[in-house]
Design a protein with these regions (language model features):
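Single conserved hydrophobic/aromatic residue that forms the stacking wall/gate
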Residues: 1-17
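HhH-family (HhH-GPD) DNA N-glycosylase catalytic core used in base-excision repair
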Residues: 16-203
Length: 203
């Protein structure tokens, strides 16, 4: 919480929250009985990240979430990291049929062949975008003008619609507007903590 608040010049917010993490209200989606979920909510979700390795990891995980809960994916996150070589982009781009078969037989991750194949083809497109734009965050900024949007209670917006349409045009799969909106929330491009949450910021 401290790093998040200070990174955005919100020292006053940190002072209000300091010492109260154990008691503060959290977003309604956060399962308070799951320590991983609470830590993710408090220290990661909604904090702006611009590095390609993190953005790639989150895009893959969000694509696997389709039809499932984020909590399910988060619980398997370390398994995904192990299975996907810590989401090393070049390594994932080089995955062959043998590696696909290995992933499809790995019961510790989501064994959906379509999603697994999509994650690899999407990785190659992701790498192409990085080469074309300089970074994936620079690509996102083409649609957001580098702004951070503060909004709650939505599942799509104009940004997610446009980014989703462009990624699909480039050949990516499992990147519908709802998934992309969730991705943008996760990486801090859209800040969506509930109004009742202790980390809510009104802009």
């Amino acid at each position: 919480i401290r790093d998040f608040c200070l990174s955005r010049g919100l020292g006053d917010v940190y002072k209000r929250q300091r010492g109260y993490e154990a008691y503060m209200n959290r977003c309604k989606w956060c399962d308070l009985k799951n320590p991983k979920y609470v830590e993710y909510h408090d220290k990661e979700w909604g904090i702006l990240r611009t590095d390609d390795s993190y953005l790639f990891e989150m895009l893959v995980l969000e694509s696997f979430q389709a039809g499932l809960s984020w909590e399910c994916i988060l619980n398997k996150r370390e398994n995904f990291r192990r299975a996907y070589d810590e989401f090393d982009l070049d390594k994932v781009c080089g995955y062959d049929e043998e590696k696909i078969a290995e992933l499809c037989s790995d019961s510790s991750i989501v064994r959906n062949k379509l999603k697994i194949r999509a994650s690899i083809s999407n990785a190659r497109i992701f790498r192409d975008i990085v080469k074309e734009q300089g970074s994936f965050y620079d690509y996102l900024c083409k649609f957001t003008d580098g702004e951070i949007l503060y909004e709650c209670d939505k599942t799509t917006n104009e940004w997610s619609d446009r980014i989703s349409a462009d990624l699909k045009k480039r050949g990516m799969k499992f990147v519908g507007s709802v998934i992309i909106y969730s991705f943008l929330q996760a990486v801090g491009v859209i800040y969506s903590h509930d109004r009742e949450c202790g980390l809510y910021i009104e802009k």
